[in-house]
Amino acid sequence: VTALIAQGKDQGLDMSLLSAVLRINHSQPEEILKLARKHRPSLQGARVTVLGLAFKPDTDDIRESPAFPVLRLFREQGAVLTAFDPIAKPVEHEAMRGVTLANSTLDAVRDAEIVVLVTRWDEFRQLPQMFKNLNLSPLVIDGRRVLSPADFAVYEGIGR
């Protein structure tokens, strides 16, 4: 992203829009934390699941993954963390310190009080049915606006 800004400046382009997008992207983890605290002011001991560790779906690329800052912020608040990604398994990454890596979406959400969707994997669209089948109603924070708020008892979406 930094390279894109430099390239744009080299070509004489106004980079204010790209800079604004970058500022918004960097503020997303704090926004997610803010939405969680709206429902649970203290996150100490909260069971939080982060879904999606890859930078984007259908890849195992974790470079600049938006999940890592989210995990760090929740860890700083004392949350008990679980994460799942269908392909990416970054067990050695610093951001995964103290995070339980689940084997499936079901294992990841079964005991969660808060579920944060970070990457748009198609299988995460099955959450409403999964929650219904298991009689679960965690707070769902949809960081990608791919889920319908009407499908969840407690829903927060970035930009909604």
What does each of the following model-derived ranges do?
Residues 1-160:
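Structural/interface elements that position substrates and couple domains in central-metabolism enzymes
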